[in-house]
């Protein structure tokens, strides 16, 4: 038998304001230790140099991660005009330059082409797999790859500031799977001036906002204390945008065993995804059919 992972059975969400210079996995490991949590994961990777909202799921909350990663997210990012890099961000080597600088009106006009359902090609330095190997590993070896375009929904893309001729501050709200570096690269190409991302910050992700995030200094200072536990948000927070149905006592027993259970619902369409509660606690996520919830995920959070 494998070794049993030590730690507490704690469930919920700790929202971290990730600093630059750490991987998302490193932040999750710090949170797991600080809370002495048995299980933890995150809802959407941030590049090491990016900052902002990293939603860390604890315990049974990890079962709700797909519903957060699929939600809209907002990013604020600064673009450096006039330079292309091999990584599409400031960490890479400058591989081409341009003296052309577009006007604000030209930038605003170009942004409109990136709104709605678009296709974007991931950066060469990305975690996309090519023949079973991460693209960034091949790129580090000097290989140039043809990566397939991927669909992305962009809800909005706005010009926030133009501090000088070389820099533009943008804010984007988008769906799952977007590469901000690709947006910068493609915008620079569309404007004919080249561009890369200089800085990137995620300001919210689904129901989680940077305004309610804890920084790592605070988390480490409060490690293994009730004060840090007080920062943990309920598991149900991740389900704010999903309709709720209430399980009957008998239905709750059936749902907890992974079987369809009777629920009380109003205005829920047949086949709609929703979550069931019993005594104000989430117990299952599934699809509503004729007065019953057919569970896809069963939640067994500790009291």
Curated annotation (Swiss-Prot):
**Where do transmembrane segments lie in this chain?**
none
Gene3D superfamilies registered for this protein in UniProt: Pseudouridine synthase
Task: List the InterPro entries hit by this protein, alphabetically.
Answer: PsdUridine_synth_cat_dom_sf, PsdUridine_synth_N, tRNA_psdUridine_synth_TruB, TruB_C
Q: Does the keyword Isomerase apply?
A: yes
Q: Where's the active site on this chain?
A: 47 (nucleophile)
For the protein in the UniProt heading, the enzyme class is isomerase
Provide the function of this protein: Responsible for synthesis of pseudouridine from uracil-55 in the psi GC loop of transfer RNAs.
| Listed name of the protein | tRNA pseudouridine synthase B
Which species does this protein come from?
Roseobacter denitrificans (strain ATCC 33942 / OCh 114)
Name the lineage. Bacteria, Pseudomonadati, Pseudomonadota, Alphaproteobacteria, Rhodobacterales
